[in-house]
Amino acid sequence: MKPIIFSLPRVINNESIPPPINKSKIYFDDNPSPKLIKYGFNNISEKMDLNILTSDSHYKAGLNIDFTRDDKNSFVSKTAEIFGNQYDPAFYQAWEILNIFDLINKSESIYTNIPETLLEVTNSHKKLFKTNKQYNITNDINKAINIQLIYSRYSDIDIDENALIQLIYNDLSSLFQMQIQGSNMILQLFNVQTQVTVQLIYLLSSYYTEAYLYKPESSSDLSDNKYLILIGLRNKSTIDLPKFPSNRYLLSLGVNDIPNNFTSVIQCMNSFVMPNKYETYLKIINYLNTKVYEGATYQDLIKEQNKFTLDWINIFTEPDKIKTILDDSINFVDKNCANSSKLDELFS
């Protein structure tokens, strides 16, 4: 297991305030923003029929984690030995993010739309690592003042890219209003293949000192689920956006001239995530096509899940190993993305 974290280039190289949003250049349309090849879109997605695949419950044997398994070697049972309880995917994803980026130690006031999950994460962290840090966690926007960390998770299942953009867009003004200088914000994303999503990521990155994209290891290999992690708000800021009209799509945020080194990270991320999803899909299809659901292939798949479980516990419950994840992953990704970029230049 090698967690893959994509570090986005700094949008502003000094402490200046990002340029104001030009509302006149924000454009809505009757048609959704299309997926573009230049951001890594290809026809792999068109080759997968996930509805047919997931209609057969046996498909879960081919996932990295089957959260419905409850035998003694399952992910939920083994991690319950560590955390004391069995949790849903949202818990493990938040656990990874908050620990990798050390946000759980740097934040006391937290605003989130999944307060129960964040409470479970912080309580588990205190018990496991023997700390007495206190947290103020709220989902009440009226009580969200001087917030140090925002954690927004929008869905347990994949959401269409254009639909998610509307949800985030409608939240932005209030999310920025509650933050203070130095705050951190985590936003759930899914596909990142349209111009408007890349514009949003670029725009938000300009307000923070660091920005990352991360697909948690505990997220399904068949899911497009990932997170935008924004570290260190440069200055207390407000975002004034026009109202999102009903029955329309956001086509542009008016952000032009996004540098190539920024979009190349998006391309590289998709070049990691999409093939892995397709390989998982083919593995499961081949297993289901055998019609032998508890034979040798099944046993091999369960062994893979059991190994994944032990690897996850070994990495994400050991403080010394957690501390190395970010740097190790960024070095690995930077090297591979640089090689990918050179190949693109050679064949362009």
From Swiss-Prot:
The record, for Gene3D superfamilies, names:
3.40.50.12760
Keywords on record: Virion
Main subcellular localisation:
virion
The record's subcellular locations are: Virion
Q: Which domain of life is it from?
A: Viruses
Q: How is this protein annotated for GO cellular component?
A: virion component
Name-wise, this protein is: Uncharacterized protein R383
Organism of origin? Acanthamoeba polyphaga mimivirus
Instruction: Name the lineage.
Output: Viruses, Varidnaviria, Bamfordvirae, Nucleocytoviricota, Megaviricetes
